[in-house]
Every structure is written in structure tokens, then in C-alpha cells.
């Protein structure tokens, strides 16, 4: 929310400053482009736009803070609608109370959610509610679900995408029934998972793919795994991706950060903080990659990598909540329910753990030897010790009072 406010204020101030041509940041022009969606105008709106961005919200209350928060989100949507006005994307809002029947018809249940209607699909946006993130998300959605790789330079560009899941298939041509099944499968995961295809034998040979074969690339892995039992139907591809879409090592991204955080293993995340642009952070990330590659067959291991540079407004919150210093690499286990956490002791930046030491620590986490409940017990023990100390103090004071009483009796005698 702070980011939204700063963004709006920053854009407002920029409107009063001079800028060279070609660097004029967009500022809200005051024109209303976001409309209220109802049963009456639903068909008309759906026919008009290729893509419909829908914000499903609770009724606006009389609370001033809640009103300001709603207004800020509305301004963000207006700015995004203005920037993408030429892209034939509609922007609407649905009041959960006024349009309860419509919400039920569309399958919306979670207030405060942002949905995108594309064809017959509904895609939920589960990322940071910020103008730049939303614009990038929507632009990715209007692109073709499959990107074609035809030459060596495009292969190099493909290979440089290392921090996200990607698939690449080799097909005869665009009319191939297996390519069409691949396209249909890609639509299920757009824009979160990238699908690529090639019709070039030279590209396929370089990537070690046979006809109608699809390679599945896990983030940060050296080699892909070939999906078995080719050729595939749409349903088979979708099922395989769903079964393997939790990588051994994955980044937290603004566009799907909440969905990723909710995708925990038994209520916990193994979280690693490392700045890729920092030498120590880069070194630590390379160690994490090695650990992930050595343990990619372990279904119980999933490490969530967070680059603090991607979330500047959350750094102070994370440091306070987890009681850690994010100016140096960190790795810990976090309980997603109450944010309790336990962190590996890293003495200093010059003494980062080796891959073997990290693996030993992770094994202790997976076995339950290291867990956040132990941290709670230690806190309770500390509280108990403090209580006992207080009791001891009370006993001492009581003894002193008794001694004073005896002295008084002697004086009376």
C-alpha cells in the first residue's frame, strides 16, 4: 500500500517537472476509464474488450482509512487503464454487496482480488497491487501463449532465462495437432509459466529434442527433464506441469508473490535472502543453486529465494519480523501461519556456509530437528525463568521481612 501511495505521489510531482522528450512518465489525466460492472452491462463489456481486468471489492465503508486505501487502488487501476488504453483491455470494478449475484455467476468469492477474463478463462492476479507490476502482467497476457524459437540468437535468449520454469517443444509445424495441444496447455499457465516451441531441426538438435518431444526446465538447473511418453495430449501436459511446478529453488516475484507464499510445504518455507547485485549475495545464491542441483530429486525440498532489491518496501518489515539483518545473506525456516522463524547462524559475510554445510542444515530442517516450534519453547522457557527469578526475589524479600519482624520483637522485649 505504501508503494502505491509513493507511486501516485511521485507521478503527480513528475507532472510538474520538466522532462526530456521520450522520458515523460504517465500521469493520471482525470478521465474515468474504470467502470462498475453489473448484470446489465456485462454482455456489452465482454463483447467490447479482448481482455477484462476486474477488481472484486468489499463495500466501501465509512472508515476514512479504508476509503483512502480504496481510492489509492482505484487510482492505480485508472493509471493502468490509461497506459494500456490502446491495447483493448477493459477495467471494471464489482461491489460484492451490490452485485452479489454477478459475483456468484462469475465464480468470485475472495474480496480484494483482481481477476482477468480472457476468452473462457479466468486468471487471478496474486501479486503486488502496483501499476508497473500490473502493466507488465497484462502485457504478458495479451501475447501469444507460446513463443517461437527459430535461430541461435533466440536459443541464447531462451537459455538465459534461468530463474523460472519454462517448457520447450519441437514440432513439425504450426498445423501439427501436437503443437496445438501444446498451445492449449500453455494457456492454462499464462503468464506465470513460459512455453516455447521450435519447428527448426537445428535448434531441436542443439537442445537435444526429438520430434513432438517437450523439455521441462526447472529454475537454475543445468539440464531439462524430457516429459515422458510423447506425443502428449493437452491434459497430459497440464497434469505434468501441475505436478512439477514447485521447483527446488524458486524466486519470489512481485507478479505472483502471494500465490508463491501460500504454496508452502507442511506450513513452512525455507527462505533465503540474497542480493544478486551484491558480491556476497551473488556468492550465496550460487551456493544455493549448487544445493538445489544436488537435491533436485527431493520432493520435500523447496527453497524460496528473495532478493531484497525486488521488495524495498518490505525490507524493514522483514528485518523486524524475522529479527535478521538483510544487508547480508540469510537462510531460515519460516512458519507461514504466524511468521515464527529460525535462522542459520552465519558469522559474517566472509565466512558463508559451504554447500555441504547448507545441506546438513536443510536436512535438520526437513527432519524436524530444526523447527519454529523449538523457538517458541525457548521463548516460553525464558519467560518461565523470569517468572522463577521473580518468585525467588519475592522469597528473599519475605525472609528479610521476617528477620525485621524478629528484630522488632527483640526491641519490644
Curated annotation (Swiss-Prot):
Q: How is it modified after translation?
A: Phosphorylation in the C-terminus, probably by CK2, moderately increases calcium buffering capacity. N-glycosylated.
Protein name per its UniProtKB record = Calsequestrin-2
What does the similarity note say? Answer: Belongs to the calsequestrin family.
Quick one: where is this thing mainly located?
A: other
Single GO biological process annotation from the record = negative regulation of potassium ion transport
Signal peptide region: 1-19
Q: Where does it live in the cell?
A: Sarcoplasmic reticulum lumen
Q: Which residues carry this modification: Phosphotyrosine?
A: 282
Q: What is the organism of origin for this protein? A: Rattus norvegicus (Rat)
Task: Provide ranges: composition bias, Acidic residues.
Answer: 373-413
The UniProt entry's GO CC annotations, sorted and at most eight, read: cytoplasm; junctional membrane complex; sarcoplasmic reticulum; sarcoplasmic reticulum lumen; Z disc
Q: Carbohydrate attachment sites?
A: 335
GO MF, any single term: calcium ion binding
Amino acid at each position: 500500500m505504501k508503494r502505491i501511495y509513493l507511486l501516485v505521489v511521485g507521478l503527480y510531482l513528475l507532472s510538474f517537472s520538466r522532462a526530456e522528450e521520450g522520458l515523460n512518465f504517465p500521469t493520471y489525466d482525470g478521465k474515468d476509464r474504470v467502470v462498475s460492472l453489473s448484470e446489465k452491462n456485462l454482455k456489452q463489456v465482454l463483447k467490447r474488450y479482448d481482455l477484462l481486468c476486474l477488481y472484486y471489492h468489499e463495500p466501501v465503508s465509512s472508515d476514512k482509512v479504508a476509503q483512502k486505501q480504496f481510492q489509492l487502488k482505484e487510482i492505480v487501476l485508472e493509471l493502468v487503464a490509461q497506459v494500456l488504453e490502446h491495447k483493448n483491455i477493459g477495467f471494471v470494478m464489482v461491489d460484492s454487496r451490490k452485485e452479489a449475484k454477478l459475483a456468484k455467476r462469475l465464480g468470485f468469492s475472495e474480496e480484494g482480488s483482481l481477476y482477468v477474463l480472457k476468452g473462457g478463462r479466468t486468471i487471478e492476479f496474486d501479486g503486488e497491487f502496483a501499476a508497473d507490476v500490473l502493466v507488465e502482467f497484462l502485457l504478458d497476457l495479451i501475447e501469444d501463449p507460446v513463443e517461437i524459437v527459430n535461430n541461435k540468437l533466440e536459443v541464447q535468449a531462451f537459455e538465459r532465462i534461468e530463474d523460472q520454469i519454462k517448457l520447450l517443444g519441437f514440432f513439425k509445424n504450426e498445423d501439427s495437432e501436437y503443437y496445438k495441444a501444446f498451445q492449449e496447455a500453455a494457456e492454462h499457465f499464462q503468464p506465470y509459466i513460459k512455453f516455447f516451441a521450435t519447428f527448426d531441426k537445428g535448434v531441436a538438435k542443439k537442445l537435444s529434442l526429438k520430434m513432438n518431444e517437450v523439455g521441462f526446465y526447472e529454475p537454475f538447473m543445468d539440464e531439462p527433464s524430457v516429459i515422458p511418453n510423447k506425443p502428449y495430449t493437452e491434459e497430459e501436459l497440464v497434469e505434468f506441469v501441475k505436478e512439477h511446478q514447485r521447483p527446488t529453488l524458486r524466486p519470489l516475484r512481485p507478479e505472483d508473490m502471494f500465490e508463491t507464499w501460500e504454496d508452502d510445504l507442511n506450513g513452512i518455507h525455507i527462505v533465503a535472502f540474497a542480493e544478486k547485485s551484491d558480491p556476497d549475495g551473488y556468492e550465496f545464491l550460487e551456493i544455493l543453486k549448487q544445493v538445489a542441483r544436488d537435491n533436485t530429486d527431493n520432493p520435500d525440498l523447496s527453497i524460496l529465494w528473495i532478493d531484497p532489491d525486488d521488495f524495498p518496501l518490505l525490507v524493514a518489515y522483514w528485518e523486524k519480523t524475522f529479527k535478521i539483518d538483510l544487508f547480508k545473506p540469510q537462510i531460515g525456516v519460516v512458519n507461514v501461519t504466524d511468521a515464527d522463524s529460525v535462522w542459520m547462524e552465519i558469522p559474517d559475510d566472509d565466512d558463508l556456509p559451504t554447500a555441504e554445510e547448507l545441506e546438513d542444515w536443510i536436512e535438520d530442517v526437513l527432519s524436524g530437528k530444526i523447527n519454529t516450534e523449538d523457538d517458541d519453547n525457548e521463548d516460553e522457557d525464558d519467560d518461565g525463568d523470569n517468572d522463577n527469578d521473580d518468585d525467588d526475589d519475592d522469597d528473599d524479600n519475605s525472609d528479610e521481612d521476617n528477620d525485621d519482624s524478629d528484630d522488632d520483637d527483640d526491641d519490644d522485649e
